[in-house]
């Protein structure tokens, strides 16, 4: 190669918005391995709604398996099932959503107490991967998606975008 070429920046296309209901966190204790890796926290998912290009309900039974390495950061690994409605009624989408949430220690404490925190004060970004039950939704498995989220006292709001 002789010269570096700058490629066009990817664009984002909004796909859907989720309102996910959760119940109280389960503290699973300190993680051990190659030194202390932080704490494990499990957040049960109790339901929710999906609006946008795909529509449906977040079914109860999923969970967010969090690794909390310090007072400011949580590595999230949420897995849950969406029952689709509208054009795809009867079909399902399985979501595996990896995320990073970072805030000041004070804002993290407020979130843990169930107090509201301005979403602009919290870095909450995700990269969902989907499994689908119908060929008409295969585009969900053939593209890269990113998202932004906000934690509320009883749930999470997430917007998913497809990289173009």
Task: Go through each PLM region and give its residues.
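Beta-strand-enriched cores of mature, soluble protein domains
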Residues: 1-164
